[in-house]
Amino acid sequence: MNILVYRWNSYNYIDIIATFQSMGHQVDVIEQELESYDEDEVFAARLHGILQQKNYDFVFTVNYFAVISGVCQQMGIKYVSWSCDSPLLSMYHKNVFLDCNYFFLFDKTNYLEFKGMGVKHIWHLHIWLISLQRKICGEESSG
């Protein structure tokens, strides 16, 4: 798979990217400070251009960015976001209802709330599963 990762100042991207790559996936990374999580015309244009250049299977982020969701919807590309914050205020945006979105939330209350509001592709994913996997496999974090 070809995966585009939007990387911002979050602690867990090194492990996520390494995991995707260890599974045989091609990972490209885009980094840019956003004016707003909801709207940023300059970033949206840049992302649109990148998505036109290569056939990506999905865009991945830690936490949710409505601006990315909007571009993915326009381009017909899946947007996968994994939330490790609670409450994730950026999810209280109309774009959460777009069909391109695939949410993985660690907070069960938030999961139930958004599922109840009609968000289509949403799952509850415990953060401790990653820690448990490392303990079982004897792996240490790479960063």
Tell me what each language-model feature is.
Residues I68-W82, L88-L89:
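Well-ordered mid-protein domain cores that form the structural environment of catalytic cofactors
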Residues M1-M75:
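N-terminal pre-catalytic "stem/leader" segment of glycosyltransferase-like enzymes
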Residues V42-Y56, Y79-S83, L98-F106:
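Short, structured secondary-structure boundary patches
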Residues Q26, K78, K120:
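Residue-level detector of anion-binding/catalytic polar loops
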Residues S81-G143:
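Catalytic core of nucleotide-activated saccharide and alditol-phosphate transferases
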